[in-house]
A protein has these predicted regions:
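Active-/binding-site microenvironments in catalytic and ligand-binding cores
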Residues: 1-247
């Protein structure tokens, strides 16, 4: 009991930052996935005596996690519902690449990642959750009422991670890799994938989760405690998340 009270007191004294975007109809997402749809008055006070919305959304909506089954036919049994609820709890290390102004199709090399690590005084260790801040969540700000071409740009354009970065993270034995882009390690230009070494080679085949669509990484320090839980979707290829940073 004393340990629980101590934990509660500790948590109440710390900062908590939400790292997810708000879900809404036709929000930006991966260009070939179905759109998010929210039926706002599925039930209403006038007809039903209460208010309720109906959500129609792909598993990979907003901030979300990819399970190995998402892209690997030989791991079709590794769906999101089989993993423990605390699979995405752990120490997070942020790699801030936002000042590099990477363009869609660019690949961040290991030399730059190591430079940022040295500048911020962090080291990647086994079990870490490594999150890349490309500054691409700026393209999710106030886009809800913009034309579809502008709203969808984020889901079709992104920088990615060079192969040496993906190999480095695999060799370090990290728990998960994430970013504020739609596909983390993958680079694409106008919906055409130009590179992607993590999904099918270094990350998912080796049990390293991929977190995509993070929002607000600029608000958190270089190291913090990360918590996120996926929905327990039977046979799910992934799940939406509401991740938080605690520091």
């Amino acid at each position: 009991m004393e340990s629980i009270q101590a934990l509660a007191q500790l948590l109440s004294s710390m900062h908590v930052v939400d790292l997810s975007p708000t879900l809404y109809t036709n929000m930006p997402g991966w260009h070939s996935h179905p759109n998010v749809m929210i039926v706002e008055d599925a039930r209403n006070f006038a007809q039903n005596g209460y208010f309720l919305q109906t959500l129609l959304l792909p598993e990979h909506s907003g901030c979300h996690v990819d399970a190995p089954a998402h892209v690997l036919p030989d791991k079709a049994d590794q769906t999101i519902d089989i993993f423990p609820a605390n699979s995405l709890f752990g120490v997070a290390k942020k790699i801030d690449l936002s000042q590099e102004h990477y363009l869609p199709g660019d690949l961040a090399p290991l030399s730059k990642v190591e430079e940022v690590m040295a500048q911020t005084g962090i080291a990647i260790e086994k079990g870490d959750i490594v999150l890349f801040d490309f500054g691409y969540d700026q393209y999710l700000v106030d886009v809800e009422k913009k034309p579809a071409s502008q709203r969808n740009w984020w889901g079709e354009n992104e920088p990615g991670l060079a192969e040496d970065v993906c190999r480095f993270l695999f060799e370090k034995g990290v728990r998960a890799v994430g970013s504020d882009t739609p596909a983390c390690d993958m680079a694409q230009v106008n919906g055409q994938i130009t590179a992607g070494f993590g999904h099918r080679k270094y990350f998912l085949p080796n049990g390293i989760f991929i977190i995509e669509g993070l929002y607000g990484l600029a608000q958190v320090p270089a190291s913090f405690y990360f918590m996120a839980m996926p929905l327990k979707i039977k046979g799910g290829s992934g799940s939406p998340l509401r991740p938080i940073a605690i520091f």
